């Protein structure tokens, strides 16, 4: 057999054994090329958000390269170690290290650049689809065209050639450093030896669980009123991050082994074949991969959490728009409102107009606040709030000497908590009126321009409102003292009405609920698009790494399967244990990552939107379904190994 035949044979073998690596490499190249193509596509700037579309895509492509580079280099480390005995045999038959390096380099050139070429072709073919997905998410009305960019091609080739150069340096360093004897010991030295579990290890296991639970508890109290300053919040967030990450590392280092040992002892040491194959492997292998599993779990939690928060903002855009704009269309002056009404009538669009007089008054709300944040902006004893008459609020009749608050965001409900009752003081220019606070309504009566961005409006008796109007403080009144809202009666006429609104709103001083919702969808749609694809890339790469580790374990355990089958155990007996083992190997990092992301999202979801459960559950279910594919593939590989063991 000559060198060329040897290279081709090894290449064929590698393609058969590491097809998932080739797939992940092709997928990564395709996604990167598609992203870079979008970056240079003129159509991307049709995405009207508060950030430039091309700039966002460029940032995403840099993060994508980082994820892909780490995956490829780590996967290469696994492969070169798995082939250490093969390299040792080459040296035993007289090959020099330089010649062995040339053989490996030739294999990698064909495998790597073949995948690169296929990936670029695939990336070009899906670039239009990716652009269509982006336009759909951000609700942009534009045509997506298939666009080939030479700049994108050059950038992709340069980036992946750089990664390939790093692979070659790693391989050369590995071959140069290893002696023949050490090459035959590489795989056997990578796992911890089976030994009795020490008290120290049990202590580490217990400490890991305590640290994780402590981090969860602090995260649940983050905005509950216990941390009242920015510095306190920063320290608490830093503690949560450190506690959960260190706890996760200790969990894999000791907790899993500790819990598995408790299960084993509870059975008196008598384990069936399924328990032997699952528990034993987890007890003595998982802790050797503690750092890797910690990174995978942490980044999985980060990806799920960020995607959940972005989707919460996207999902809540319409409700957030309803909170910010109290009618379909809100006007700051009567002149433009009249012009808009005339245009609606000319187009036969039915509508209802409502004008609500609004006063600004300083209100002492200190008595009804349940705790006062130390760094709260504004004085609770002199808070500027919008005041409206109960006559202008349908279905509300406020008695003399009483007041009702209406309209309050989820964010303010977490940061500024009101009691159920108490006394507030409404101040006019010369007088102060004490009023009994009678509770909080959800309805937003006026747009955010009247309410300092989301504070509640105060509903008072009409006679008191007239009195306050006569004695109002002119220094705090807004230029517009009347909220003018226009609601379109039929939803199917909303788009047309919004087009007419754009003709009137030339100075962007008025508000459209539809435009406000679209702006939020555009911004967070872009974030969701980027985080979604980055999360998908990480999911595939991390799933592949776990799969490769299982491939290595299955080959190491092959002699054990041979013995077990000779003892009379069937393939079905062994596969049953393997399924349980893979549920642990893939399930534990997934479940821990889901818990991390759940508590992270729960601690601050209200900063991003008004709906939490539906978006979060959808993201978690989708991530779990895709992640489970790798567990299924690893079971199939084990089946093949068990079948060939006898």
Swiss-Prot record:
What main location does UniProt list?
Answer: membrane
The conditions that induce or repress this protein are given as: Expression is induced by bacitracin, via the two-component regulatory system BceS/BceR.
Q: Where are the transmembrane segments?
A: 18-38, 60-80, 115-135, 152-172, 197-217, 232-252, 290-310, 526-546, 588-608, 616-636
Q: How does it sit in the membrane?
A: Multi-pass membrane protein
Q: Name one Pfam family in it.
A: FtsX
**Keyword entries, A-Z:** Antibiotic resistance, Cell membrane, Membrane, Transmembrane, Transmembrane helix, Transport
GO CC terms: plasma membrane
Q: Where is the protein localized? A: Cell membrane
Could you tell me which InterPro entries the record lists for this protein? ABC-4_Integral_Memb_Prot (IPR052536), ABC3_permease_C (IPR003838), ABC_permease_BceB-typ (IPR027022)
User: Which BP terms in the Gene Ontology apply to this protein?
Assistant: response to antibiotic; transmembrane transport
Quaternary state and interactors = The complex is composed of two ATP-binding proteins (BceA) and two transmembrane proteins (BceB).
Q: Which family does it belong to?
A: Belongs to the ABC-4 integral membrane protein family.
**Stated role:** Part of the ABC transporter complex BceAB (TC 3.A.1.123.5) involved in bacitracin export.
Q: What is the protein name for this chain?
A: Bacitracin export permease protein BceB
Which organism's genome codes for this protein?
Answer: Bacillus subtilis (strain 168)
Species classification: Bacteria, Bacillati, Bacillota, Bacilli, Bacillales
